[in-house]
Each structure stands twice: as structure tokens, then as C-alpha cells.
């Protein structure tokens, strides 16, 4: 098969391909005892799942299910869901949104794909416009979303702040950060996937000032952030203005299978997003919107996130963090990024004698799936690879699994890391 240039970009093997295949294998394999410590699949929390069971039963009972699956939805999203979301965000965040500020897509991944290729890439004037990531590493799912290849993305290496002997935090290096004439937008996830980092309110305010002054939008991937699902372990102030594009998702509230993404932006951007949704898929999936709307309207969703979802992930993070000194000890140079949100730990093994890709392969051979960290540095120039080994020394761990599987999986990782250092 002969692929077009765009086909070549979209089918190139990247980290997200391995991630999704490993995720499916670990979750659905008949092989017992596999440790799925990769991927962003949320935990199955009974109290949350019960909400969706009740909502689905009501849709079947009142006859709305037939319309839900038998008719196309509006290409911009379900009007009732959008009205409920706008009302909720305005009340909780003090914003002044209108329905014209919201569009629904087939998941947060598709929202970012649409926005990236709508704003950046080759332009009529011959310029290739870029998406700038002010703090790398960032979400591996962005890596293959460009229709013109890696030229669309540029990233900034972070500053590393040591907090104690085994804990560090990435910070934006504003001395390195430059918004250029070809910069189409500045983008980051907050809380950050893969590290669990939360860019501080002060850093965010500075980014907002810089992007507003440059006349380019600031995109925030809010898949884990406030006010929903609010998987944050430090205070985080929700932020939006007309120079910002905020993306959200229903995945992390327990509905990844419904593929429901949300874009919040000024009306001209929303109209363009809706046009691209219509062209690419006619309309977004309406199941997730229908399941969630009643709980948005009556406050149940916010309460369950506050009382059940966020505390669950905080406990999981604390349990996983407590395992690290026990399993890794003091014989090897291990560090973990400060866990401030999301559902991951980001481990750094300074001077690791093997690459993180080889560590991933060794763990996988023993039934433990992790994510090699170098994929998350996709936006950094290749020429920086040699002088900065850090990006080959990190792995991402998901802590959504049971305590037994977390202990088993992290024990495998610790064993393989110790072997690597001892054989160097």
C-alpha cells in the first residue's frame, strides 16, 4: 500500500500505539496477574459506575434511549448538556460562558487533534505555524496528531527543582520560553500527564500574559483538572478567558468508552471546531452527554467527584508513593515527581545504565506494563537528545490498579532497575 504524506504521518508508530495495545492486553487478556501500570484508563469505582447504571436505566425506561442510538445528534453537541455545563461552570468558576462558547467532540484526543491542525501547520503565506509546549514532558497522545509531522511541535525543556532527596518538580523555564511569529498556540496539560505536575497559578498567569501580548491562544488540556473531575491534590484555580482554549473530557469521571470531549473557547473558534466535527464524523457521541446531564443539573456529579473520585485517587497516590522507599531503597538513585494531581507517578532514575525503552521491554516481559518516558518529550528537538540523557531515564506509572497489583508491578520495576545498575 502506498501512503500519502498525511497517511505516513498518521500511521507512523509512536508511543500512543504501544500504550493502547498494552492497555488492552493487560485489561482483557486471559493471562492472570498482568500488572497494567500504563495508560490513562480510569479506575472502576463502584460508586461512580452506579451513577451511569442508574442514568442508563432511566434512559431506557423513559424511551429516550431509542432516540439516543437511533438519531444523529447536533454536530456541536446536545443543547441540554451544553446548557447544564455552561450553568455549572459559570456558577462554580465565576465565568461568563454562553452555549456559543462550547463544542463537543469525539473525546479529548479528537479535540486536541482538531485544534492543533486547525491552528497550526503549513499556511497560505508559506509559513509553517507551530504548537508550542512550554513544559516538556507532556501528553504522549499529542505526538502523532500533526498532519505535517513533527515540524508542527516545539517544546521547552523544563527546569528541575529538587524538593528533597527523592522528590523533584518540573517548572517552566521562562528564560528559554520564546513565543515566535510562527507560534499558533501555546499548549499544556494541567494537571500534567505524565508527571502529575500542576503548573502553579503564578506560572499560568505569566503564560496568560505572554500569550495575550503575543496574540496567540493558550490551550489548557484540563482532562484531570478543576472543577470536574478535579483530580488534584493541591489547590488549583480554574482559569479561562477569551484568549484561552480549555479542553475537558468525560473519560476521567469514569466514561472513557463514551468518547466525549469538550472544547471551551470564544465563538469563532467553536464554530470552526463544529465545522471540523461535521466534516470528520458528522456529530459527536451523544451517550456520555445523556448519561451525565441529570447529574450536572442536580449537583450529584460535583458531589461524587469531591467526596469519592478525588479522595480515591489521592489515597492511591499516597499508597504508591509509600511503596517507593520500601521497594527501591537507598542503593540506587531513584526520584519521583511531586504528585500534585492526575493518576500517574513519574519516576526518574538518574544515570540509568539502560534506556527507559529497554526498561519497559524488560518489565513487559515479566507481565508489568509501564510507559517509557522518552515518548513524552516528543516536542523537544532531536539534537538535544545527546546532551540531555534525562529524557531516557524516566518512566510513567499509573496508580489506578488495586494495591496488590501496584505492589507487584512496582516490585518488578524496582527489581529490573536494580539489576540494570548492578550489571553496569
Please annotate each region the language model reported.
Residues 1-76, 80, 87-91, 181-182, ...:
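N-terminal "arm"/small-domain region of PLP-dependent enzymes with the aminotransferase-like
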Residues 127-131, 146-147, 156-162, 240-314, ...:
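Conserved core segment of the aminotransferase class I/II
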Residues 61, 66-214, 219-240, 245, ...:
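Conserved core of the PLP fold type I
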Residues 83, 87, 91, 95-96, ...:
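PLP-dependent enzyme catalytic core of the Aspartate aminotransferase-like
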Residues 37, 85, 102, 131-132, ...:
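Generic structural signal for small/hydrophobic residues in well-ordered secondary structure
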Residues 36, 307-321, 333-348:
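Conserved glycine-rich beta-strand-loop-beta hairpin in the small C-terminal domain of fold type I
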Residues 332-367, 375:
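Conserved PLP-binding catalytic core of the aspartate aminotransferase-like
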Residues 40-44, 109-111, 138-141, 191-194, ...:
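Short, solvent-exposed loop/turn segments at secondary-structure junctions
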Amino acid at each position: 500500500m502506498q501512503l500519502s504524506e498525511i497517511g505516513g504521518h498518521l500511521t507512523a508508530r509512536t508511543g500512543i500505539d504501544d500504550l493502547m495495545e498494552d492497555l488492552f492486553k493487560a485489561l482483557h487478556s486471559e493471562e492472570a496477574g498482568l500488572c497494567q501500570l500504563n495508560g490513562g484508563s480510569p479506575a472502576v469505582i463502584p460508586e461512580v459506575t452506579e451513577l451511569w447504571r442508574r442514568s442508563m436505566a432511566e434512559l431506557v425506561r423513559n424511551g429516550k434511549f431509542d432516540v439516543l442510538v437511533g438519531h444523529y445528534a447536533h454536530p456541536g453537541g446536545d443543547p441540554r448538556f451544553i446548557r447544564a455545563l455552561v450553568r455549572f461552570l459559570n456558577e462554580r468558576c465565576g465565568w461568563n460562558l454562553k452555549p456559543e462558547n462550547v463544542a463537543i467532540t469525539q473525546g479529548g484526543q479528537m479535540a486536541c487533534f482538531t485544534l492543533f491542525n486547525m491552528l497550526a501547520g503549513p499556511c497560505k503565506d508559506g509559513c509553517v505555524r507551530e504548537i508550542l509546549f512550554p513544559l516538556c514532558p507532556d501528553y504522549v497522545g499529542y505526538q502523532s496528531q500533526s498532519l505535517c509531522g513533527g515540524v508542527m511541535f516545539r517544546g521547552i525543556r523544563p527546569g528541575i527543582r529538587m524538593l528533597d532527596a527523592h522528590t523533584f518538580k518540573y517548572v517552566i523555564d521562562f528564560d528559554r520560553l520564546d513565543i515566535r511569529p510562527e507560534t499558533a498556540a501555546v499548549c499544556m496539560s494541567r494537571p500534567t500527564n505524565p508527571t502529575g505536575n500542576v503548573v502553579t497559578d503564578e506560572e499560568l498567569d505569566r503564560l496568560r500574559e505572554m500569550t495575550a501580548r503575543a496574540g496567540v491562544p493558550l490551550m489548557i488540556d484540563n482532562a484531570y483538572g478543576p472543577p470536574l473531575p478535579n483530580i488534584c491534590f493541591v489547590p488549583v484555580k480554574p482559569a479561562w478567558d477569551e484568549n484561552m482554549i480549555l479542553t475537558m473530557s468525560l473519560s476521567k469521571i469514569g466514561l472513557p468508552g463514551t468518547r466525549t470531549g469538550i472544547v471551551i473557547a470564544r465563538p469563532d473558534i467553536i464554530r470552526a471546531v463544529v465545522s471540523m466535527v461535521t466534516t470528520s464524523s458528522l456529530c459527536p457521541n451523544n451517550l456520555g452527554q445523556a448519561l451525565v446531564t441529570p447529574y450536572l443539573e442536580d449537583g450529584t456529579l460535583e458531589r461524587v467527584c469531591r467526596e469519592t473520585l478525588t479522595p480515591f485517587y489521592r489515597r492511591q497516590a499516597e499508597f504508591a508513593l509509600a511503596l517507593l522507599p520500601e521497594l527501591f531503597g537507598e542503593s540506587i538513585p531513584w526520584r519521583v515527581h511531586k504528585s500534585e494531581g492526575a493518576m500517574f507517578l513519574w519516576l526518574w532514575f538518574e544515570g540509568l545504565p539502560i534506556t527507559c525503552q529497554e526498561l519497559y521491554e524488560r518489565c513487559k516481559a515479566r507481565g508489568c506494563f509501564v510507559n517509557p518516558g522518552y515518548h513524552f518529550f516528543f516536542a523537544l528537538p532531536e539534537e538535544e537528545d545527546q546532551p540531555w540523557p534525562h529524557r531516557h531515564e524516566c518512566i510513567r506509572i499509573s496508580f489506578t490498579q488495586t494495591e496488590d497489583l501496584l505492589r507487584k508491578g512496582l516490585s518488578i520495576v524496582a527489581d529490573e532497575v536494580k539489576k540494570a545498575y548492578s550489571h553496569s
